């Protein structure tokens, strides 16, 4: 009958509408919970910043470490979708017949939407962490560059001239992007690259160190330690012994060695310069005859 078929078709449309509305309502509830969690997290971080600032410690370190750890530990687990029966008047369902289960396609679409939202949140959190660490790297390289400028201030190499020359040689425009974090990260890394090139030009202007490093001789230019001269005190040791004295010990024993050498010379000057002759008697015994000068 056409009336019954149209009635069934109308009931089916109403069931589909109620099912879609239920899914949308659950999605809105999940989004509200996520927003509440994000707001609570922002309040916690803001409270930590206030406490750290009042204690006199730099808040950037604590905030960056917290954000970086949370971005690495962020788990992208899509929540399960629970089907609910729409309630009508007096807490009864609008249709006495049992509701059909949601089709797999609709469940897959809902989970895919939730998964995409979690991915976006995790990527944004990780991007913010990378931006904070790029600022830390740039601050560290600025300190190193300042030390290099002080170290080579008496040389004929000017840091400002080298830096301006490098900037003019390789000036590449930064790609425009809608993300301020990505643009800032590119600017910080570009600044770090220029600072490293300037440091390399200050330390090795003619490329000698780089050539030695490429040839595999990193210690070819290092001077060899000076050899210590042997003293008369060391000559009295037995042939099997090779005493080694450090430089401070050699300095400490130098006066003693000089005095020992002087005594040795005096002993030689005052030594007995008599000549000993051995003469054999007729009876076969030797006779020691000493002739003094």
From Swiss-Prot:
Its lineage opens with: Eukaryota, Metazoa, Chordata, Craniata, Vertebrata
The protein's matches in PANTHER family, at most eight in alphabetical order, are given as: CENTROSOMAL PROTEIN OF 170 KDA (PTHR15715:SF17)
Stated name of the protein = Cep170-like protein
Superkingdom, according to UniProt?
Eukaryota
Gene name for this UniProt entry: CEP170P1
Disordered: where is this region? 78-110, 217-270
What family does this belong to? Belongs to the CEP170 family.
Q: Which organism is it from?
A: Homo sapiens (Human)
Q: Where is the composition biased (Polar residues)?
A: 227-245
Q: Name one GO molecular function term.
A: identical protein binding
């Amino acid at each position: 009958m056409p009336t019954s078929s149209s009635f069934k078709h109308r009931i089916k449309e109403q069931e589909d509408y109620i099912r879609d509305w239920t899914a949308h309502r659950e999605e809105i509830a999940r989004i509200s919970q996520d927003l509440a969690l994000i707001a609570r997290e922002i309040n916690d971080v803001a409270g930590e910043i206030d406490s750290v600032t009042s204690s006199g410690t730099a808040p950037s370190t604590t905030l960056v470490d917290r954000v970086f750890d949370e971005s690495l530990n962020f788990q992208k687990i899509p929540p399960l979708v629970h089907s609910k029966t729409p309630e009508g008047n007096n807490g009864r369902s609008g249709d006495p017949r049992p509701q059909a289960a949601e089709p797999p396609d609709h469940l897959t679409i809902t989970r895919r939407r939730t998964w995409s939202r979690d991915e976006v949140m995790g990527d944004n959190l990780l991007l913010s962490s990378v931006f904070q660490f790029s600022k830390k790297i740039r601050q560290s390289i600025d300190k190193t560059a300042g030390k290099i400028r002080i170290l080579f201030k008496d040389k004929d190499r000017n840091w400002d001239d080298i830096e301006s020359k490098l900037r003019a040689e390789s000036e590449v425009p930064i790609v425009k992007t809608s993300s301020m974090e990505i643009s800032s990260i590119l600017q910080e890394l570009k600044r770090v690259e220029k600072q490293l090139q300037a440091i390399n030009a200050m330390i090795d202007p003619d490329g000698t160190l780089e050539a030695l490093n490429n040839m595999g001789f990193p210690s070819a230019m290092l001077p060899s330690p000076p050899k210590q001269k042997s003293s008369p005190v060391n000559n009295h040791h037995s042939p099997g012994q090779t005493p080694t004295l450090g430089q401070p010990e050699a300095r400490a024993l130098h006066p003693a060695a000089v005095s020992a050498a002087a005594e040795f010379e005096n002993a030689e000057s005052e030594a007995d310069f008599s000549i000993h002759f051995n003469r054999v008697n007729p009876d076969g015994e030797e006779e020691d005859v000493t002739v003094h000068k």
